[in-house]
């Protein structure tokens, strides 16, 4: 119609995959194989198609592919903004206006909006600030049973990691893990710098509580997420074994990419 604003991977990669996935879903079929690419290629095992990502199904069933992509972009920018707002309020102790500025900067900033061409990356990154919100609620809480808080954190991390993995961009989960490590290290630096402050004992207690809970939450949440997403991870892992890049890339190839 010449009315669709799309370029690069959106138009050439995701539109065809989403259209094929939507057609399969409407016919109650799991698309294991793609017969339209070369002499055929695995479809489900290509995690970037995001067939099992739960927020893809409604837009696939209700909207034509171009509108489905647009709706998903808007939805996940909203999810990212709400998550950034809550994370800013809970993690940094910001007020309403500070949280709003955080939401706008994250959801409409250059990095996230640049990923609208890579819908699976946008979908995964939209959940990133929600990890900070869950972590802050669990690790900073002084109330409640320790194991209840650990369980709540593990459930939250499991659901969020599952959504990221099913969105189809595994690197986003890696980025999230690095973020949580940096966040923990920043907490450690904060506690060390304030060790002689009048609130030192309280900070020391929070510091010990933080490191008692963090490994448990990450291990439990990550383990449950792997089980929940095995329906996607196992076919993808099998496909990786057949890849020409299965042995990894040379440093020169990594840097040039």
Please provide the spans of the model-predicted regions.
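Amphipathic helix/helix-loop-helix segment enriched in hydrophobic residues with interspersed Lys/Arg
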Residues: 186, 210-214, 242-245
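Juxtamembrane inter-helical linkers in multi-pass membrane proteins
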Residues: 198-200, 247-257
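Membrane-embedded helix bundles of polyisoprenyl
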Residues: 75, 79-91, 96-145, 149-190, ...
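Membrane-interfacial, low-structure loops and terminal tails that flank and connect transmembrane helices
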Residues: 142-149, 190-215
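Helix-to-loop transition at the C-terminal end of transmembrane segments
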Residues: 1-12, 230-247
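A glycine-rich phosphate-binding loop feature that marks nucleotide/adenosyl-phosphate handling sites
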Residues: 180, 220, 241-245, 254
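Membrane-interface coil-to-helix junctions
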Residues: 1-81, 104-126, 252-257
């Amino acid at each position: 119609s010449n009315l669709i604003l799309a370029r690069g991977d959106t138009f050439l990669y995701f539109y065809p995959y989403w259209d094929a996935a939507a057609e399969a879903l409407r016919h109650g079929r799991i698309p294991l194989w793609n017969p339209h690419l070369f002499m055929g290629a695995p479809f489900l095992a290509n995690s970037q198609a995001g067939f099992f990502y739960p927020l893809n199904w409604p837009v696939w069933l209700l909207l034509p592919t171009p509108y489905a992509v647009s709706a998903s972009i808007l939805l996940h920018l909203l999810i990212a903004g709400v998550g950034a707002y809550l994370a800013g309020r809970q993690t940094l102790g910001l007020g309403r206006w500070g949280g709003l500025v955080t939401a706008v900067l994250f959801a409409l900033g250059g990095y996230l909006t640049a990923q609208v061409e890579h819908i699976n990356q946008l979908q995964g990154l939209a959940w990133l600030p929600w990890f900070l919100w869950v972590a802050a609620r669990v690790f900073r809480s002084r109330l409640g049973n320790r194991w209840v808080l650990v369980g709540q954190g593990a459930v939250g991390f499991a659901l969020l990691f599952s959504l990221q993995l099913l969105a189809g961009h595994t690197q986003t989960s890696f980025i999230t893990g690095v973020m949580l490590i940096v966040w923990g290290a920043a907490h450690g630096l904060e506690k060390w710098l304030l060790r002689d402050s009048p609130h030192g004992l309280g900070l020391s207690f929070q510091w010990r509580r933080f490191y008692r809970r963090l490994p448990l939450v990450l291990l439990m949440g990550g383990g449950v997420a792997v089980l929940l997403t095995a329906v996607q991870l196992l076919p993808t892992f099998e496909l990786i074994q057949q890849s020409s890049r299965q042995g990894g890339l040379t440093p020169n190839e990594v840097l040039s990419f």
